[in-house]
Amino acid sequence: EKMEAYDDYCLCFFDHISEAINFRLADADTYLADLDKQIKHHTYEYKRLVNDENFDQLSSLFRFEELGKLLIKKIEYLRTHGRENEEDGIMEEYKYVPDVCSFKINELLEKGLENDALKEIDKTIAVYGDDGYNTTEPWHLQKIEILERRNDKANVIEEYRRLFRQFLVDKRPYLEKLKELVAKEDWDDFVVKLFGDIPHITDDDCIEVCNMIVEEKKYQCLLKILMDNRMSFSRIELFKKYAHYMSEKDQATYTEHVIDDLRKHLSYAKSKSYGYIVDDIKGMYTCCEVSKKLILDFVEEVEYNYGNRPALMRLLRN
């Protein structure tokens, strides 16, 4: 309780005060024991995810920043006390903590061992996969610096392409870089493939990428992006914003998929959900002429199949 009283003031956590005191006054074993206690506190979730090979969660939900700081602190402390032989065990046990990965890569770069650094970067990125929820972004950028020094333009383009497709990343700077690097005569085909190879889309990503597609006048790419994001609460608003850039065929394809989703929803929906379904029907009705016609046909279908649901019929008529 006394320790909590210190923590509640938010000036400094007592563990940090205790560690600072031990760092100055305690012998090495006492200080390391204190560090190990803190490391253990942050270790359980990390080891569980590594054992289950849940690296998507390891990089997106649990960044383990505090664990990483403590491990680097321990490694540096061991070195200053001539106990470098103990650090290999730490590096192996916690080799997937992002800070530990970066520590190894940065050391190799500081020593001028670029080939070894590239191998370490590739090995680390491979663990998390191309789409590293931003965890792999700094390693891709380090790799780009090395490749640029070697004038390896093709692989620089490939790294920027991999960065563009990442989840939760600002894609705009990477599109601009790619536009500078890719030959003008190859750009049209390249950018169409680029827009078609984005594995995860959020609402923000959807808006950003759709705006890029419109700027590049590659309107045929809009359908896939909107389809990938069609379970979003904002799907109708987004379709309405970009529908007029799409071909009538693509407008119809998107509308039919939304109608199919609504049809499935209606098959099990309770009365409290009717308002949301009817709101989507009304929204799709106003998006474009193609969706308007298809929605009118769907409303007739709903009236025929669910005419015995007065609450739903009342909302539709209103």
Where are the model-predicted features located?
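Eukaryote-biased, non-catalytic alpha-solenoid scaffold regions
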Residues: 1-318
